[in-house]
Amino acid sequence: MLNMLKDFKIIFRTIMEEITDTQEFTKDMTFEEFKEDRKTQKAVIRGLEIIGEAMNQIPKDFQKKYYKVDWSKWIKFRNMLIHVYHAVDLELVWNAIQEELPTLYSRMLWLVENPFIPKPSDYKK
């Protein structure tokens, strides 16, 4: 994947799109409503999985350099959602949506708008 990727900003934009969708899906919802809405849960969880998987495509050296994004937290969160699918803690998911995604969005936006972000060809995975 990394060899085919010409620009990390494609990944960052994908993450931003998933955040926007997740926020739109849960807009005006309470946690109680979210707990009862399996369709929204599934859509949101899938979006969070995509965010973690996209972040996992970013080389570790890049992650270390741009440490204000908690790459490993989101990758671990994705792994938990994928592998503990039978017992996902919806409160944890809800808190991520409400408290973590806005900050992540602003950090992804900064990376997208930064003209000095290196290209994938500058890194080995």
Residue ranges and their predicted role:
Residues 1-125:
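Solvent-exposed interaction patches of small proteins and small membrane subunits
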